[in-house]
């Protein structure tokens, strides 16, 4: 028959192992895990994605224009993904109507398709 010291040691070891396994399993859903994950994501720099052919004409930061020198049009929406478009006054006159029709076609399709899915 094992001694009481051996039984207590085995019992303590099994409790410690169960606690370690429980902590490892619960850390996935714990709030502390989410905080660590948010800290890791915040270290990544925000990237500005622009096609190479269009660089320099989308915003005043690229061409060195002073803010407020021209009328500007800015369109921004976020329906499955974030979309933002900035146009100067001349660009708005030139591309505004086709861009408006394009956005209307896209948004109108989603409005007409949404009730059909329900």
Curated annotation (Swiss-Prot):
Entry keyword Lipoprotein: yes
Keyword Lyase tagged: no
Lipidated residue numbers (O-decanoyl serine): 27
Keywords from the named record: Amidation, Hormone, Lipoprotein, Secreted, Signal
Residue stretch(es) of the prosequence: 53-76, 100-118
Predominant place of localization: secreted
Entry-linked Pfam families: Motilin_assoc, Motilin_ghrelin
Superkingdom of the organism of origin: Eukaryota
MF GO annotations: ghrelin receptor binding; growth hormone-releasing hormone activity; hormone activity; protein tyrosine kinase activator activity
Localisation: Secreted
Record field: compositional bias (Basic and acidic residues): 32-44
GO cellular component entries: axon; extracellular region; extracellular space
Family label: Belongs to the motilin family.
Stated name of the protein: Appetite-regulating hormone
UniProt source species: Sus scrofa (Pig)
The gene coding this protein: GHRL
